[in-house]
Amino acid sequence: MADLNGVLTNVPNHFTTQFDSNWKHLVQQKNSKLKEYVTIDSIEGKEKSYNQIDATSMTQITDRSKDTRISDQAMAKRWIRPTQYDCAKLVDEWDEQLLGEVVLPTSPIIQSHAQAYARTCDSIIIGALGGTAYTGTTGTTATALPAGQKVAVNFVESGVAANSGLTIAKLRAAKFLFDSNEIDEEEERIMVVSAKQLQDLLRTIEVTSQDYNSVRALVDGALNTFMGFKFRRSQLLGKVSTVRSCYAYVKSGVILAERGLKTHMDVRTDLSHSLQIRSVASLAAVRMEEKKVVEIACDEA
């Protein structure tokens, strides 16, 4: 049909809609942010123990030909026990035909599983930083991160204590604990915080401060080191009410034991020949020494 001016009026009713033939991942953390900064180990069997030996001291000799003085050597064990994880998706046997020109999402699903694995690694590492470590001969003694290795949410260097986010004072407190514990100065010190802590840190510094440009670059991502800590941002850090637990640690302070990610693709005859894409992993992490980890409580109210 045409109008009085000869313009076809029904043509718009037949305009087509184009559909993308590919799949795009929605926003998410795609790579592990912490795995590179812990000690990676392999594991066989249901559990693994790590032998530890404590510091000893020498005694001055004051007499000639005196009986040899024997002192016991303090030793310890740390245990790690892997947990199994999986993720499975089904692709119906008719999906390839029904999707038409749209490709089957098999590759994007496998990529999605790998991204989930990366986030799981980070969550397990974070859990080990502040969680319970098992020690003793049989690994049944629960060892918590002591209060002496924690910077309180209301910590101030002077004046009246008040809840706060991440401050320069809290960073100094964490550094002091590491220095007091004689943490090897050659070991890289990692600081895991969320986006809110980076903003808080910038807010607490005056523009005229000599630290301002460094923190500004830290927030902008142009710099990742400040006050001797390499900063890693993670939104997976635990939060209770308005208080988020952030962590400072060194690489030797945490072990992540893994068997790697395995992905299986099988046709399920019991499910109408659907294609099953299933990824499995076995993971565990343990805090190796309490003195190598500092928990910093940050208010996000």
Per-segment meaning from a language model:
Residues 2-34, 39-58, 79-81, 146, ...:
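Sequence/fold signature of self-assembling virion shell proteins
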Residues 49, 55, 76-107, 171-203:
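Structured, hydrophobic secondary-structure cores that serve as assembly/anchoring elements
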Residues 64-75:
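Active-site-surrounding "flap" and adjacent substrate/cofactor-binding loops of secreted or lumenal enzymes
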Residues 96-177, 295-301:
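Alpha-helical scaffold segments that mediate packing/assembly in large oligomeric complexes
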Residues 131, 196-200, 237-238:
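Short, catalytically relevant binding-site loops at active-site mouths
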